[in-house]
Amino acid sequence: MDRRTQWLRGVLDLCVLGALARGESYGYEIAQRLEAGGLGVIAGGTLYPALLRLERLGLVVADWRTGASGPARKYYRLSDDGAATLRSAGADWAVFVGNVNAIMEVP
Amino acid sequence: MTADDWLAALSAELRRRRIDPAGPVGEAAAHLRDGGQDPLEAFGPPAAYALAVVAGLRDATPRPRGPSGEPRLRATGITKRYGRRTVLNGVDLSVHAGEVVAMIGANGSGKSTMLRICAGLLSPDSGHVRLGGTVGYCPQNGGTSDFLTPDEHFVLVGAGRGVGRTEARARGRSMAAALDWADAPRAGQSRHLSGGTRQKLNLILGRLGDPDVLLLDEPYQGFDNGTYLDFWQQVWHWRDAGKAIVVVTHLLNELDRVDTVLDLTPGRAR
Amino acid sequence: MKKTLVVAEMALREISRRRGVLILLALLPLAFYYSRRGEAYWQSVRFVSLGIGWTLSTAALFAGSAARGIEPRLRIAGYATHQLYLGRLAALWTVGLTLALPYYLLILVDLDGKVRNDAIALILVLTVAVAPPLGLAVAALLPRELEGMLVLLTIVAMQMMLDPEKTAAQALPFWFTREIGTYAVESGAGADHVGRGLAHAGATLVVFLAVVALATTLRLRRRSHISMA
C-alpha cells in the first residue's frame, strides 16, 4: 500500500485534471470519480491542497455556487492551460509507464 | 473529535496564518457532510491540514524587496574579543525601515553579543553603530522585574518613552492579546508567570513606545507553537508598518520570508 | 521629575510586595531595642538606630540588585541614569521614614523624660538618610546579594564592637548615631556632639551618594561607539 501511495503522490494532480476533463465538479464528487476509477479513497487532506495548487497554477478555474439545497459549493473546471497540460503530461506519462514496464519485465 | 470542533480548530489555525478561513473551511465542511467520514481520517489533524492549505496557497516566488533609503541601523566593522577568543570579527549589518534581518549562527557565534552592541549595552573593541531612530531591545530572558505586575511594567517602560499611563497600559494589553495572552491585565506579579508568558512580557516591553528599530534576541523562548506563529505574524505586521527589525534565531523555518539573513558562523560568507 | 516619580512609585510597589523584607524591617530593630533595654537604656537608642540602619540598607541592597535586570532596558526606553537611582532612593527614604516613625514614638513613650526627644528624632532621620545610599552603593559595587549582605553585616558588627572613641570608628557609616546619642542621653553633654555627628552624617551621605551615582552612571553609560543619524 505504501508504494501505491507514493505512486499516487506523483500523479495525483494529473489524475484530478483527468477527472475534470469529464466535466466540472466539486471536491467530494472529484474524490468519488477518482475512487470509481480504481485509485482508492483519496483523503480530503490530500485532495483539497492539490486543488488549491492547481488553481494557483491556473490549470483549473474555480467558482462558488449556491446550491438549490444546502450551502455553497466550490466548483472546479479545467482551464485551457489545464487541458493542454493534461494532454502533454499525459503523453509523457504514457512514455514513462511504457519504459518502466519494459524494465520491470521478467525475461 | 466532532466535525464542528475540527472545523473550528481549522478556522483558528488558518486565521493564525493570516489566511481567510471561509473557503477552505467551507469546502471541508461540505466534504465531511457528503462523505460522513471522521474528520481526522479524511483530513488529518487540523493544524497539519492548515499547513497543507497554506503550502497550496503560498506564492512560491519571494517578493523582491529593495532597501529603501538610509538604513535605520548601520553597524560597520564590529569586532569583539573576550580574552583570546574573537567572537565578532569585522561584522557589518544594515537594516532599513520595513526590513527584517534574521541573524543566525551556531551557539557562541556572537549573535547575542552583536545585538547587545547594536542596542548600546556593550562596547565593541572596534567598529561603529549608527542609529536612525529609537531602539527597542528584547533579550533572551530577564529584562523584567519579579515583583511588578505586567500592567506596572507597561506604565514603567511607557513613562520612559513619554507614553502616559492609560495609553501605555492599553498598548501593552493589546500587544499581549496579539500574542495570545488575553488575561495580562489580571496577571499578578511577574515572578508568578510561566517562563513563556514572562518572555511575552519581555517582548512587549521591547516594543512598547513604538521604536523604529527592534532588536529581538530569540524572544520566543518558551512560546508554545501557536504563540510562536503569532509572534512571526506580528513581525511581518511590524515590517509592514515600516519598522527595522533584527531577529536572532536558531530556527530556520521562517527564513524564506525574511529579507536578509546574516550568518555569524565563523568562516561563512557574510 | 515625572519619570523619577514613576521609578519611585514602582520601587515602592516592589518593596511592599516583599513580605519577608518588610517583616524584617519592622521587627528586627525592635529586637535590637529590647536586647539592651534591660541594662542601660541609652544603649537601646543606639542599638535601635543601628537596627534600622542595617535593615534599611539591606532592603536597599535587595532593591538595587533586583533592579539590575531591568535598568538597561529602562535606559534604552529613555530614562536618564540619575532618574533611576534617585527614584529608587526616594522610595527607600519614604519606607525608612514610615518605619522610623513608630520607633520614634516608642522611644518617646518608653524613655519619656530620660532623653532629648529632638536629638532622638535627628538620629533617626539621619540614619534613614544614610542607610539607602549605603545599601545601593554596596549593590552597585557588588553584583551578588550574598557578598553585599556580608559586607553590611560586617559593617553593623564592627559598628557594635569597635570602641567609638577610636578614630578608626569614624570611618564607619553610622558613627554619628553614637555621637548624637551621647547628647541625647547625657544631660551634661554639650551641643558640639550634635555638630560633629551632623558633619559625619553629612559626609557619609555625600560619599555614598557619589558612589551610587558614579557606579550606576558608569554601568549604564551611553557607549561611545553609537551615534545617532
Predicted stretch roles:
Chain B
Residues L214-E218:
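Catalytic Walker B motif of ABC-type/P-loop ATPase nucleotide-binding domains
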